Amino acid sequence: MSRIHNIAVACMMMLSGFATMEGQTGDRQTAAQKYIDIKMKEEPFKSGLVGVLAVTAKGDTIAEFNSSRKLIPASNTKLISTGLAIRGLGPSFRFSTRLGYSGYISNGTLHGDLYIIGGGDPTIASGDRMTVKTDSLFAKWTRALRVAGIRKIHGHVIGDGRFFDGPIENDTWSYNDLGTDYGTGGNGLCFNRNIQTFSVSPTTVEGKVNAEVTYPATPWIEFRNCAVTARPGTGDNLYQFNTDLAPVAELRGSLAIDKGQKKESFSNKFGALTCAWEFAKYLEKLGINVTESPADIDPYDNIRYTEA
C-alpha cells in the first residue's frame, strides 16, 4: 500500500470516570439489604437463580444475597472491563479517528485515495446523546479536507478498521447470536455501533416476510430473505446470519402474522466500509466528487472494493 499522509485528528471521545462509593453508614447498608431481601421474594427473582454482592471501594458490604453461589456473570463483566479501561487509560484518554490520503493533490484534486483510519472509537454515528452527531462529525472531516486543499477525489474513500487484531467477534459466541445487534462485535472503525435496522412485516401464513433495510444503506451486501410468516401467537423468531468474510447476509426464522410492521436491528459486519460509504455520500452532496466506489481493508491488508 502506498504511503498515507495524515490530515487531521477528526473525532475524539473522553472516557469519563466512575464515581466510587465511599463508606456507607450502617443505616444505609441496612436499608439496601432490606430492599434486596424484599425484591428477592418477588418475581422474576423468586423463581430464578440470583446472586448479589455490593461493596464499597473500601470493601465494606452494602448488600448481599447468595453471594457465594456460582453463577454466569454475563454482562456484569462489562463493569469490570470498563473499570479497568478507565483506570488503565486515564481520564484524559481520547479515541482518535484520523484522515489520510495516498497519491498527490493537484489543482484541488486528490489523485489517490482518501483513508478514514479508525482508532477504536465505538461512538461514531452511534446516536448517543454524549457523542458528536454524524453530520457535525462529517462536516469536521470535510473542513480538514478543504484545509488540505482537496476539492475532488479522483479515487476511493477507504475505511480502515484494522486498529484491533483478530476477528470482530469472539469465536465462543453462539452462532445464532452473531447476526443480532448485540452480537455485532467491534472493529477499529465502527459506524452506528455496527448495527443495521430493518423494517419487517408479516404477509400471509407461510408467506415470505417483508424485510427492507432502513439504515444505514449497504447496497454492496447481498441480502437473502428466507424468513416466513407464522401463525398468530408464535412471536418474533427472526435471525440474521452474516460474516465479515463475505458481503452476504441471510434472514431466517419466522414472524407471527399478528405482529404487524416493526423495526428489527441486526449486526453489520462492515462498519468501516459503511463509514466510508456514508462519508462519500456526504461529500457528493456537498459537490465534492468521488470518482470511485468506497472500499475497506481486510485483516490481511487487502483493499476490498465495492461494486455498488
Predicted feature locations:
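Short, conserved beta-strand segments within well-ordered enzyme catalytic domains
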Residues: 51-53, 64, 72, 115-117, ...
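Short glycine-rich, polar/acidic loop-and-turn segments at beta strand-coil junctions
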Residues: 56-58, 75, 86, 120
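Short active-site loop at a secondary-structure junction
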Residues: 64-84, 88
